């Protein structure tokens, strides 16, 4: 896989047999206060403020909870027992991964964000189209767009894609 862990493998690839090595993270000491949150972004946005808000939400219907369940288990440091066909733990489904709800999630977040600058990273294959994002951003301030073309990452040689590249967008809002 491409550094995601969506389920237990029926047959192990060579790369899956390597030991997982966890090394301590080194953090730079600073006089500044750092805070980490683990809650719904649209609830949290009503409690925080700042100069710059950088957003990098899921682009598609693939849930982060499923793709990164091993990392979540490591972070939780609990006695999880895999169950079911995939072995995944229960996780909260995100409205950012639902086509019918994602535009409202973004609109609510932008409307309630008490930040001067908002940057949103999103690609051309996401659930939201370029014009949808532009329309939402333009309702709240001055909008700019930057883009960068990237060669598509192919997780395995058997996959076929219509496109060999993707475009990453940086949507910029000055509120």
For each feature predicted by the language model, list its residue ranges.
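Glycine-rich S-adenosyl-L-methionine
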Residues: 72-111
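Conserved Class I SAM-dependent methyltransferase catalytic core
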Residues: 96-149
């Amino acid at each position: 896989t491409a550094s995601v862990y969506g389920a237990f493998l029926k047959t192990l690839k060579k790369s899956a047999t390597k030991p997982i090595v966890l090394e301590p993270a080194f953090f730079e000491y600073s006089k500044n206060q750092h805070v980490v949150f683990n809650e719904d972004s649209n609830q949290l946005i009503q409690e925080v403020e700042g100069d710059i808000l950088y957003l990098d939400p899921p682009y598609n219907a693939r849930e982060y909870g499923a793709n990164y369940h091993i990392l979540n288990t490591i972070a939780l440091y609990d006695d999880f027992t895999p169950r079911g066909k995939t072995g995944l733990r229960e996780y909260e489904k995100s409205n950012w991964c639902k086509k019918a709800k994602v535009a409202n999630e973004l609109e609510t977040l932008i409307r309630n964000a008490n930040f001067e600058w908002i940057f949103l990273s999103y690609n051309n294959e996401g659930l939201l189209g370029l014009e949808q994002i532009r329309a939402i951003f333009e309702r709240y301030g001055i909008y700019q767009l930057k883009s960068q073309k990237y060669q598509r990452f192919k997780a395995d040689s058997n996959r076929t894609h219509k496109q060999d590249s993707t475009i990453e967008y940086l949507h910029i809002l000055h509120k």
